Amino acid sequence: MKAQPLPQASQASTRRWSPRRWATGILAVVLFLMLAIQFVPYGRNHVNPPVLAEPAWDSPTTRALFVRACADCHSNQTVWPWYSSVAPVSWLVTKDVVDGRAAFNVSEWGRANNEGDDAAETVQEGEMPLWFYVPLHPQAALTPDERAQLITGLTATFGGGYND
């Protein structure tokens, strides 16, 4: 008696589990999920509340440097970039703006717990702007001279810093 050869796997079943099919399936699922999360409303309703009051800036230069490097998160005059409407990035951008406004908002000057006394120190220590902000907003990149000028102006406007 001759040994019967093992049946060959059909081409259809081999193709079903090929790496290319897996990659196509995974890509389809990822695209579907990316489309589905666009319907989550958080992060798309970009609201800039009215400006209630601003601090008495020590100079127009300090204000201009602040607007350029800080105001998107620390004022009610946020310029919302196109990617702030695409989830999940919109969720992160909205969270950063909400947190920034809650911590320090120059558009609601005089509100309780809204002093800028540590603003100069935060910039001087390199904590602000956040590490990922400048690559996405090149206009916010300050030269060393501009950074020093901003720190001096923030100290003059709000007090605080290392010179107190």
Language-model features: where?
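Electrostatic cytochrome c docking/interface patches
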Residues: N45-F66
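Extracytoplasmic electron-transfer domains, predominantly the class I c-type cytochrome c fold
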Residues: W91-H137
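C-terminal capping alpha-helices of c-type cytochrome domains
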Residues: G126-E127, V134-Y162
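Hydrophobic membrane-insertion alpha-helices, especially the h-region
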Residues: T24-P41
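N-terminal membrane topogenic signal
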Residues: W17-G25
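Acidic helix-start/capping segments at beta-turn-to-alpha-helix junctions
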Residues: W80-K95
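The canonical Cys-X-X-Cys-His
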Residues: F66-T78, M128, L150
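N-terminal Lys/Arg-rich, disordered targeting/topogenic segments
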Residues: M1-S18
